Amino acid sequence: MSIGNIVQCIGAVVDIEFPRDAMPKVYDALVLEDSGDASFAEKGLTFEVQQQLGDGVVRTIALGSSDGLRRGMEVKSTGAPISVPVGHGTLGRIMDVLGRPIDEAGPIASDELRAIHQKAPKFDELSPSVDLLETGIKVIDLVCPFAKGGKVGLFGGAGVGKTVNMMELINNIAKQHSGLSVFAGVGERTREGNDFYHEMKDSNVLDKVAMVFGQMNEPPGNRLRVALTGLTMAERFRDEGRDILFFVDNIYRYTLAGTEVSALLGRMPSAVGYQPTLAEEMGKLQERITSTKTGSITSIQAVYVPADDLTDPSPATTFLHLDSTVVLSRDIAALGIYPAVDPLDSTSRQLDPQVVGTEHYEVARRVQQTLQRYKELRDIIAILGMDELSPEDKLAVNRARKIQRFLSQPFHVAEVFTGSPGKYVPLKETIRGFKMLVDGECDHLPEQAFYMVGSIDEAFEKAKKLQ
């Protein structure tokens, strides 16, 4: 247990000098000694070693506020990486990046600690999965179905509904799935974390969820490591043979925290100012989120898209790791259609006749073809009007507009705002409804009948009321 002294402090990055024969290893945790003076530095502040600069100096990231630090302060090496409590004691609790409780409900009842830096499972331990995970959200189940043990990304710009979609997925899957979930809040609004906690409490599933938060107001060191803390807890449950749900909101903030400290660590920035280690950092996290022969981790990650540009390096790097991508579109949100999922842009490896079955595959593809035809005709309609279209095209446009409205759905978590009760639509009902639409069995119904309903039967009932 060697003791060093702070020699330089630039924001979240702190250089600490140790005796040359007792330098801490990379990723070791260091703790600020209580100096007893009137400094307002955070007591027990933890640092994580990032680089060894030579001459006994190590460069570290402060996992907490560096306010009040000064040169000469004593820092003790723990000789081990950051370790957090894991196991059943974490369920129903809210923790920070270091696994300390922040819900004022006493200490975490767990004897087992695990380092947040772990190796990804070996290739021969991995277990591919083709079982479908029903979400009860029509557009997702139809066009971009999720796999159990798969990885899903919710892509969208600011304010198109990533968090609401994720909350609805948690609401539908965590309740139906009855397994354990881990939620990592990375650099998001504290209010959303609070809403999530109360949502889980009100629906009586709090005892099945472990929550880890490093929110917007916290230093970059916390936001950079909080995803790993949550993942470590999820891995522990997976390794005891369970099927786990792992939610991350938002993976972009993880990248951004890395960008914030990258320049301070002395790295040259790469494209758009991102850290040069972007792909490696993302790979380290994503390769650990995987299913093994022992248990599975199904992960759902919200990904913020800066300026709605999907080619930005951060979302583009995330794309590589996912099985299903749900792309939220501002144009669809502008039409008032929620969830604002773009059915032409969203993809899934599971949308394969050998996985989902021929009927599901054909209905999904026919829905996409109809919507694509409407997209192509939109310019003609804008310039010349509907009257100039051929009868076949008019029919395609009418069907596409009904499909577009039928892809909307009232959410349970949005009941407070919309005033209409949420709907969970089973996969069979979803396929039946869209099959009737593309087969022309609903051509006589008005468009409004399909907006914000659950199953196709509700659309028929709504049509009767509209007449």
Swiss-Prot record:
The keyword Nucleotide-binding applies. F-type ATPases have 2 components, CF(1) - the catalytic core - and CF(0) - the membrane proton channel. CF(1) has five subunits: alpha(3), beta(3), gamma(1), delta(1), epsilon(1). CF(0) has three main subunits: a(1), b(2) and c(9-12). The alpha and beta chains form an alternating ring which encloses part of the gamma chain. CF(1) is attached to CF(0) by a central stalk formed by the gamma and epsilon chains, while a peripheral stalk is formed by the delta and b chains. This is ATP synthase subunit beta. It catalyses: ATP + H2O + 4 H(+)(in) = ADP + phosphate + 5 H(+)(out). It is found in: Cell inner membrane. It is a peripheral membrane protein. Keywords: ATP synthesis, ATP-binding, Cell inner membrane, Cell membrane, CF(1), Hydrogen ion transport, Ion transport, Membrane, Nucleotide-binding, Translocase, Transport. Produces ATP from ADP in the presence of a proton gradient across the membrane. The catalytic sites are hosted primarily by the beta subunits. It is an enzyme of class 7 (translocase). GO terms for molecular function: ATP binding; ATP hydrolysis activity; proton-transporting ATP synthase activity, rotational mechanism. GO terms for cellular component: plasma membrane; proton-transporting ATP synthase complex. ATP binds at residues 156-163. Its main location: membrane. The gene is atpD. InterPro entries: AAA+_ATPase, ATP-synt_VA_C, ATP_synth_F1_bsu, ATPase_a/bsu_AS, ATPase_alpha/beta_chains, ATPase_F1/V1/A1_a/bsu_N, ATPase_F1/V1/A1_a/bsu_N_sf, ATPase_F1/V1/A1_a/bsu_nucl-bd. Belongs to the ATPase alpha/beta chains family. Its EC number is 7.1.2.2. CDD domains: ATP-synt_F1_beta_C, ATP-synt_F1_beta_N, F1-ATPase_beta_CD. PANTHER family: ATP SYNTHASE, ATP SYNTHASE SUBUNIT BETA, MITOCHONDRIAL. Gene3D superfamilies: 2.40.10.170, Bovine Mitochondrial F1-atpase, Atp Synthase Beta Chain, Chain D, domain 3, P-loop containing nucleotide triphosphate hydrolases. PROSITE patterns: ATPASE_ALPHA_BETA (PS00152). The keyword Transcription does not apply.
